[in-house]
Design a protein with these regions (language model features):
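FAD-site-proximal beta/loop scaffold in flavoenzymes
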Residues: 363-385, 468-538
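A conserved FAD-binding loop/helix module that cradles the flavin
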Residues: 399, 531-562
């Protein structure tokens, strides 16, 4: 692949370069030697080219090497060849000269710079694969291909979170899934439950009804099966309800503030939980006789048993939340009065209006939602012997299965979408097929068939596409392809929308939804917030929970509260590798009851026990980036206690390195390394750099070990050891350093030190050999300074 023409700016000063990088309005890249950048451009490593290359070479005072009484200062653009060849460096800082001299080839060293070597992009081959083939963590992706892939040259000292793992990225509620699974692995069940409750106050519910998109982001996909997060969450949710007095407690202090929540569905319940946790008095109004919203009235009991929901709501009552049933906005309630009586109001009335087909004689058709509500209320009336359900979502599946279990002889689902893109959860579709439901994908309703004033069926027409080229819902049909479908009941389940008849003029709406800020759920009316399906349209329970939580946090902050929730991830934290997750294996699966045993009221799926979910937690990879820092200078400068000058600060070299998206440093946008300061080493210090690589020229280190020792009377008086290409950032071997002090170098001491160097190692499945290299280099370095026998 050739490099295309790029815009180029030759900076005349550091200030100009920084300003261009920050304020040009373009994506930029700095270039000096170019040995790293040009390779990534040539190979198409990134999804797009930078808009502007900023050339640093014309800037004065960035080159050169100065040696004085206080030490060495190497300009950022000093080349590695200059460092390796400088006799002053070879005499006083031989470690630095050796490290620079091992980089790549002579031709590259003539161009490559000190700062470039320190600031190079990640060298992992998944990151560097041409044509941007792997969208990994370090590119803003959601997984690390090396953990279960080819990892022979990757970290043997754990991973670092450089972003949210796929499971957490795909969870609308932002639950810290890897963190609570880590607690489970450690046997800390209570801590795991509390981590879930920080982001999801009803895991017993979501563990049953959420589509669990998190599993589609699992790092095990393509290897075996994703971790069964849904089953784990469900079991932990039931554990929380069994000990609700411990996990869902009333607040220790009362704020004196009163909040009204209108709507007792998942968004309203979520807001009520977090607001009550903050110490506010919360009253939840709902138009139905019992709280729960769609959770109670549209999700069948075979998926979400009513006693589970009842225990969840009882737990909120235990916390002090007050529920007022049969109170509806526009009837018993007015927004004006609520604003007068309460400090804040959260509107979460949901979407209860059945969307219409717009066909003649549509009044003869039934509502799928009404069927589910009737069954939830205890009615058991058969809708018909031959039932056609219009719709392809999970609600339509619930309607079809419910009709079948009520005794319908034949139940068929017709939907616009093709089979592979039906909006229902795939597992739900498979269950429908298992229960004898027939599918008619890519068929839409054309007309209602009527005989003697009664429903006789539907005429269906072939749907050729559901969306237009811009992704807007605009079905297209083939009028030449139609079919007649005989049915004595047609139930429409094509989605619901909010009832906005109560909305006052001061609350703006758009496309049938109430308008609220997506960040804090605030409406245009002060003190009034809104969320859930009322604002977003039909969405998942997890998304509604997240909206309720956002609103609660915003309301609390506006009232002067300090409600704080745990983080959804531990980005930038070092993670221990879970070696138990490396072998392939099957996920834990909760058993579905036999077809003959399934009913309208009984739950289909049994819980996993706590032992099973702890075993399932062992399959979690606790995903992080395992790419190593491949700089040869980095471990040498760590040992030499160097400091890095930038345009904004001077910092110890140990603080320079980080694991981030597209970067290996902590440098801010527009911040440029200007020089490296290295103090004079201790008198008589013995320095060395050892490097293992596949080829003696060109290749980056498989392992690099930098050492600096001082001895007095044959005894170590100081020791500094650093490992390169062994971990996501350069690593000081402090255990080795501490052990060596006061000891004489010997075979025995070297052997113990070598073992200490890898004592905390966590090799991956394919790179344990790197530990032998570390051991050998550490041992060799110690024995090299021993006095001859």
């Amino acid at each position: 692949m050739t490099i295309r023409t790029l815009d180029h700016a030759a900076a005349s000063s550091l200030a100009e370069a920084s300003e261009l990088a920050c304020t040009s309005g373009k994506t930029t890249a700095l270039v000096a030697g170019g040995t790293d950048l040009l390779g990534t451009l040539k190979d198409g490593v990134h999804p797009r080219y930078p808009d502007l290359l900023i050339d640093l070479k014309p800037i004065p005072d960035l080159t050169g090497i100065a040696v004085g009484e206080d030490g060495l200062v190497a300009g950022a653009l000093a080349t590695l060849a200059e460092v390796a060849a400088d006799p002053r460096i070879s005499e006083t800082w031989p470690l630095l000269a050796q490290a620079a001299g091992t980089v790549a080839s002579p031709q590259i060293r003539n161009m490559a710079t000190v700062a470039g070597n320190l600031c190079q992009e990640p060298r992992c081959w998944y990151y560097r694969t041409p044509e941007n083939a792997f969208h990994c963590f370090r590119k803003g992706g959601d997984r690390c291909g090396a953990i279960l892939g080819d990892n022979r040259y990757h970290s043997v000292f754990g991973a670092v979170r450089s972003g949210l793992p796929g499971c957490a990225q795909h969870c609308p509620a932002g639950v810290a899934i890897p963190l609570y699974l880590a607690q489970l692995r450690a046997g800390e069940i209570e801590a795991a439950v509390r981590l879930i409750l920080e982001r999801n106050p009803m895991p017993a519910v979501t563990g049953r009804v959420c589509p669990h998109d998190c599993q589609s982001g699992c790092g095990r996909l393509g290897y075996d099966e994703p971790v069964a997060v849904q089953a784990v969450e469900r079991t932990l949710g039931d554990h929380a309800l069994a000990a609700a007095d411990r996990f869902l407690q009333a607040p220790e202090r009362e704020s004196g503030r009163r909040i009204a929540v209108v709507g007792a569905g998942p968004a309203g319940l979520s807001a009520a939980y977090y607001l009550r946790r903050a110490g506010h008095a919360v009253t939840v109004y709902d138009r139905e006789p019992e709280p729960g919203g769609m959770l109670r009235y549209s999700i069948p009991a075979y998926r979400l048993p009513k006693d589970v929901l009842a225990r969840q709501i009882d737990a909120y009552r235990w916390m002090g939340v007050t529920f007022v049933p049969q109170s509806e906005l526009g009837a018993e309630l007015s927004l004006r009065q609520l604003r007068a009586d309460y400090d804040s109001v959260f509107l979460a009335t949901g979407g209860w209006q059945q969307q219409r087909l717009g066909l003649e004689n549509e009044g003869l058709l039934g509502s799928g939602l009404d069927l589910l509500k009737d069954v939830a209320a205890g009615k058991r009336e058969l809708p018909g012997e031959r039932v056609l359900v219009i719709g392809g979502g999970s609600v339509a599946v619930d309607v079809a299965i419910t009709a079948r279990r009520l005794g319908a002889h034949k139940v068929t689902m017709a939907c616009l979408e093709a089979r592979h893109v039906m909006p229902a959860v795939p597992d739900d579709i498979e269950q429908a097929l298992d229960e004898g439901i027939e599918l008619l994908p890519s068929w839409g309703p054309l007309s209602v068939l009527v005989e003697d004033g009664k429903l006789a069926g539907m005429e269906l027409v072939r749907c050729t596409s559901v969306f237009d080229q811009d992704g807007r819902f605009k079905p297209s049909f083939d009028p030449a392809t139609s079919m007649t479908f005989a049915a004595d009941a047609v139930l429409v389940a094509i989605g619901q929308e909010p009832d906005l008849s109560w909305v006052a003029d001061e609350l703006p709406t758009t496309r049938g939804l109430l308008v609220a800020d997506p960040d804090d759920q605030a409406t245009s009316v002060p003190g009034v917030y809104a969320g859930g399906d009322l604002v977003s349209g039909a969405a998942t329970v997890a998304a509604a929970i997240a909206a309720g939580r956002r609103a609660a946090l915003a309301i609390d902050a506006a009232l002067g509260g300090d409600l704080a929730l745990g983080e959804s991830s531990d980005a930038s934290a070092t993670r221990e590798m879970n070696a138990a997750a490396f072998p392939p294996g099957r996920a834990a699966h909760a058993e579905m009851g036999a077809l003959s045993e399934r009913s309208i009221d009984g739950e289909d799926v049994a819980d996993l026990d706590l032992n099973s979910v702890q075993a399932e937690a062992q399959r979690c990879l606790d995903c992080g980036c395992v790419a190593v820092n491949a700089s040869d200078l980095a471990p040498a400068l760590l040992v030499l206690d160097a400091r890095i000058r930038t345009t904004a600060r001077t910092l110890p070299v140990a603080e320079l390195f980080a694991v981030g998206t597209g970067t290996t440093t902590v440098l801010e946008p527009g911040e440029i390394v200007t020089a490296v300061e290295i103090p004079a080493p201790p008198a008589g210090s013995l320095q060395a750099y050892r490097k293992s690589r596949v080829r003696n020229s060109i290749d980056f280190p498989v392992v690099g070990v930098a050492t600096m020792f001082t001895l007095d009377g044959g005894v170590f008086t100081s020791a500094r050891v650093a490992l390169g290409a062994a971990a996501p950032t350069p690593l000081r071997a402090t255990a080795v350093e501490e052990y060596l002090l006061g000891r004489k170098p010997s075979e025995e001491v070297a052997e113990v030190a070598a073992s200490l160097a890898v004592a905390c190692a966590q090799p991956l499945a394919g790179n344990a050999f790197k530990l032998q290299i570390v051991r050998a280099f550490v041992k060799e370095a110690i024995l090299a300074v021993a006095e001859p026998a």
